[in-house]
Amino acid sequence: EWAKDGVTGDLFIVQARPETIHSKAQSNKMTIYKIDEKLADSLKKQGRVLATGQAVGKRIGTGKVRLYRTYSEVLEGKRELRKLLESGMSMEEISSELSVFEEGDVLVTEMTTPDWEPLMKQASLIITRKGGRTSHAAIIAREFGIPAIVGCSDAMDLPNFATVTGSCAEGDTGYVYSDKVPFEIEEVSFDEDIELTTKIKLNVGFPTKSLIDSKLPVDGVGLARIEFILSSELGIHPLAFVHHDELKQFVESGELPAGLKPYQESFIESDINDVRSLVESLESRAWAYEDKRDLFIDKLREGVGLICAAFYPRPVLVRLSDFKSNEYRELLGGSIFEPVEENPMIAWRGASRYLDEKFKPAFEMEIAAMKSVKYDFGLDNLQLMVPFCRTPEEGQMVKDLLEENDIGPSSGTDLFVMVELPSNAIEADRFMDMMALSGGSIGSNDLVQTVYAVSRDDLEGYQNPVDARSPAVKSMIRDIVRKFKAKNLEIGICGQAPSDFPDEFPPFLIDCGITSISVTPDTAIAVRATVAAAEKAANL
């Protein structure tokens, strides 16, 4: 425990005790969930299967169904609960149906966005009607080791408040059974002293969870996502921090300041009370900051800094912000600063957003946070990655922006590009040279949708579904690895493919010669074991 002197700023350690929880945790164990095959067959014959979908992970979860069609229903439920508590009722007096969501409940909805993440962390099982194995629900479920069944067409027909069991331990199909179903949990140990040629890294996005994940036998972080910090820790659109003074001026005078003119149409359609609410919310959170942008920078650098510190000195590859416009619109103030796009997945995102004069001030706050992590915190294991970079010229301009702030390649910060577009593969040599790259990381999620021209959020709706195992994607991955290795640069993969297919995909990657594989924490041990076997077979 520590205390800081409010006058002098001195920091005092006032108490220290041996840590007894995480130090005893064993990182060389793999948990396997099993449901008896005869029992599963019997349940199917009895008609106990309420719904099916794509299984995410290999676990089993059971709990009470809490069905919400939209996140606004969650917010309304919270408001009603608050009224009951303010009237003098205690939580013990309030029925569980009015509690909104309790630890261990089963979350059922159409499709999740970052807004849902606080509820998702408490769930024993997540079921969505839409989405595939690379959807938001699947990615977050994997990171927290929560079973999920996505693309479940009958999800919204599940009986609310009923007890169900969701099994992802029976192959690619996830089954939702009625009532509680018995299952077994088995722990398997492995030898973590085996040295691998291929580095195994983690995909992380939740700073506090990285303290636990860092105990796993991995070589660092191959993908650190900052979107959770933006949505849950801040929850306000970054441009609202930039334009705080002008927003306040608009609320007070009713006249639109020059700095907000690019968003004139949004203000015409907005209720001034919504803008007032945005300003009040921002000021209540940033009351201690004269310049409201400093709150954004502080929260971002603290979150990224925690991840870097947890894994230090192992490298942490931080992907610069990659929210799409529809995701930014979910943040407070998002409807003012974001357009409504037909297909946000392939529109205003990644590098093109950073360079846009409208968004550039927000990206500059991001740069300031990263610079502080490296220089103020001294965490020199920070690496940066540019996502959704369409052309080498675009990549060079982003690199130049980083260089101007002493956080680019010339100042010793490793720069990577997310290899997720056909152009990244076709012009790989130019990307490497013009961006002075230290390496690349294959984003198989977006690579599938850009190679096959399909929306990754709706893959389950296609007659002939494709994924990272499909021939064109595998051919492109092999070509990407060859080009990066020819220049002696690191080339890894951070998409969901190795996590979704831990027995099948890593051997293919090793055959390609990939240098690192980054996976979700729940599959790290299984992938490590698969890689060890594949390397032994290949005499690596």
Regions found by a protein language model. Give the residues of each.
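Amphipathic alpha-helical
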Residues: 18-60, 391-415
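ATP-grasp fold ATP-binding core
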Residues: 1, 164, 318
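Conserved alpha/beta-domain cores
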Residues: 188-540
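Acidic, glycine-rich flexible loop/linker segments
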Residues: 7, 14, 18-25, 30, ...
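A short, conserved beta-strand element enriched in hydrophobic/aromatic residues
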Residues: 13-14, 386
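Non-catalytic terminal/interface segments that mediate subunit docking, oligomerization
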Residues: 29-110, 332-349, 353, 358-371, ...
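A short glycine-rich, hydrophobically flanked beta-strand micro-motif that places a catalytic Asp/Glu
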Residues: 1-6, 492-496
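Phosphate-binding site of ATP-dependent enzymes
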Residues: 5-11, 420
